[in-house]
């Protein structure tokens, strides 16, 4: 572990209280403890970011029109892969910048690690993690236990096993239906937190016959025409399934008054994104940044009074680093925030993305370099010091 973690230059443990004191984000804390569902959606991506995509059907009509929602883009660390890195960012709010040489769940020990799991348990939540595929993938069966999830579920607990054509992965619709059974079995007298990793849209995208595609790109992608059609079909199915899930929670609230807030984000773009990206829409790191930007949505089955706090008016794509999604979700839920989460939200206002090919970004999405603004530099470096201590 020690060899895998990079200590930031100039790190001083004694300075951490002063660094944490820079967190200025006011708390929107309430007495509510809504149920929380955090979904890592396999390969969910918006190709209109990198190509003039034209298709014969809308791809995400549900998510794009969903009322009472926050929409934007989370920026993952990698292009075309790296699910477990994104999972690590979601659960710990730690950037992979300090652990660049390892796949987190395979290379780090998470016993007693700080994460959203432990934090929500400290607030009285019961916790569950689920994935409709093999438990051994990314060592999840071990690491989820180390993180302290009260219960974990894998393929055998998703009995529907509905797939799309010849693709071997359970559909999101079936995954959500099976998950509802697991969710309803959780203790009813406590607030519930669930982390769900989907599998439907995993590559590759040449498994089905052309006749099975339900969406067809009008844009010419040459050798990637079928690949794009199958992928876009999966995206539309994911969108429809999310609508079904929201309908389930809407009915739950109407029947029982149980509040639920949901966040879903794509883990990364599909692997072929670089082959179909239009260089006219960006060059070099600018294009890479777009390839790393995956859709997210936060929605609740009850009114969200502070949704504006999660919008960045300077950036039409409302981009944020993946490490900032969970504190944004907790803020929207009205929960008390740790100093670490409050610092991340303060950082988001000044430098929304700190992980990856650029030093960091400004609120409008443009790149910033260290040395241009001392106060902002200090805020970014302070995060990495706090992260190192967090690890």
Identify the role of each PLM range.
Residues 1-3, 37-38:
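Intramembrane catalytic core of multi-pass membrane enzymes that act on lipidic substrates
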Residues 2-31:
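Helix-hairpin-helix/helix-loop-helix acidic hairpins
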Residues 20-34, 38-41, 46-391:
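Solvent-exposed soluble domains appended to multi-pass membrane proteins
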């Amino acid at each position: 572990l020690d060899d895998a973690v990079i200590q930031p230059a100039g790190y001083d443990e004694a300075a951490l209280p002063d660094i944490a004191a820079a967190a200025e984000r006011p708390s929107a804390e309430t007495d509510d403890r809504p149920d929380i569902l955090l979904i890592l959606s396999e390969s969910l991506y918006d190709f209109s970011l990198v190509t003039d995509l034209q298709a014969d059907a809308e791809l995400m009509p549900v998510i794009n029109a969903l009322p009472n929602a926050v929409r934007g883009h989370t920026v993952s660390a990698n292009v075309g892969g790296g699910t477990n890195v994104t999972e690590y960012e979601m659960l710990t709010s730690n950037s992979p910048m300090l652990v660049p040489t390892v796949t987190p769940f395979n290379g780090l020990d998470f016993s007693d690690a700080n994460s959203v799991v432990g934090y929500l348990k400290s607030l009285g939540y019961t916790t569950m993690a689920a994935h409709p595929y093999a438990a051994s993938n990314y060592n999840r069966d071990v690491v989820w236990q180390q993180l302290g999830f009260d219960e974990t579920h894998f393929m055998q607990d998703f009995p529907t096993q509905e797939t799309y054509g010849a693709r071997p992965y359970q559909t999101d619709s079936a995954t959500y239906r099976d998950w509802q059974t697991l969710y309803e079995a959780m203790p009813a007298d406590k607030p519930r937190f669930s982390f769900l990793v989907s599998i439907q849209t995993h590559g590759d995208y040449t498994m089905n016959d052309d006749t099975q595609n339900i969406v067809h790109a009008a844009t010419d992608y040459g050798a990637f025409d079928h690949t794009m059609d199958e992928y876009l079909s999966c995206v539309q199915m994911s969108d429809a399934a999310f609508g079904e899930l929201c309908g389930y929670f809407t009915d739950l609230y109407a029947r029982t008054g149980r509040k639920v807030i949901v966040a879903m984000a794509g883990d990364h773009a599909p692997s072929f994104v670089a082959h179909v990206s239009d260089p006219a829409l960006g060059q070099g790191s600018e294009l890479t940044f777009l390839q790393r930007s995956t859709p997210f949505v936060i929605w609740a089955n009850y009114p969200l009074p502070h949704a504006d706090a999660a919008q960045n008016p300077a950036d039409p794509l409302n981009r944020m680093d993946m490490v900032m999604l969970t504190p944004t979700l907790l803020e929207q839920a009205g929960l008390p925030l740790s100093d670490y989460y409050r610092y991340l939200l303060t950082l988001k206002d000044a430098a929304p993305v700190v992980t990856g090919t650029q030093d960091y970004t400004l609120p409008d999405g443009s790149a910033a370099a260290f040395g241009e603004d001392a106060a902002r530099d200090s805020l970014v470096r302070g995060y990495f010091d706090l992260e190192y201590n967090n690890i």
